[in-house]
Every structure is written in structure tokens, then in C-alpha cells.
């Protein structure tokens, strides 16, 4: 039996979180955990240890940059890859930057189920490539 990749979605839009959860879990390859604000998302990241965090940029109380900063400065969460989710940019802006801004992959809202799955798969391919490269350096 293949283990499912665990993804934590931190986004204040409950309907979007449910869309992501349904879309990714329907593939049978992902287990999706949802948190609707920054502080609870940080707590879930610390306890659940996901393989990827999908993090909204604009949220009340604590925005995505603040959440990412907190996670990146904690020993137990700093190695968890983060992909930002935003409706603040358009697809052309992100494509000009090859899908990355300041080293983080971006997923643009609104998004279709097919696009979401493709982009999450792409992020996991990058994660795997990075892990394999680091392992080859240690060998």
C-alpha cells in the first residue's frame, strides 16, 4: 500500500479549503489537513508534520508571510516546503517568474481542480529532486 502525501492547507476561505481537500484527496494520493487561520495552521504544522504546506498570503490576524516566517524559524517546521496561494497576482505575473517569487512556488486563485492537482504534483516533483540532490551530496 502506498502512503499518501500529507498536505496542510492554511487559508481563511473555508470553501476554498474544502475545494482543495476534495480535489486532492479524490486523486487517492494525498491526505489534506485544513486550518483556517495562521496561528492554528502553525500549531497543525508542528503536530502533523505535513510534507507540504499550501499557505494563503492574505489572511486576518496573521498573514501568510508572517506564518511562513514563524515556520521557517522553528527547528521542527523549517524544512517543510511551502507553496503560497494567492488571488493577489494573476497567472501572467507568476509565469514571468517561472512560478516562483522569492524562492517560493505560487498557486494562483481561482484555480480548476485539474490545475491544482498539476501544480501540487509539480511542487512534489521539485521537493523530490531537491531531496535526491541533498542525499547525493551526503553519499
Task: Enumerate the predicted regions with their spans.
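Acidic catalytic/metal-coordinating carboxylates
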Residues: 37-40, 63-69
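Short hydrophobic/Thr-rich beta-strand motif most characteristic of the beta2 strand and flanking loop
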Residues: 29-36, 44
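Active-site residues of response regulator receiver
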Residues: 11, 56, 86
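Active-site beta3 strand of CheY-like receiver
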Residues: 48-54
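Charged docking surfaces used in two-component/phosphorelay signaling
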Residues: 18-26
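Receiver (REC) domain active-site loop signature in two-component systems and cognate sites
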Residues: 59
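CheY-like receiver
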Residues: 125-139
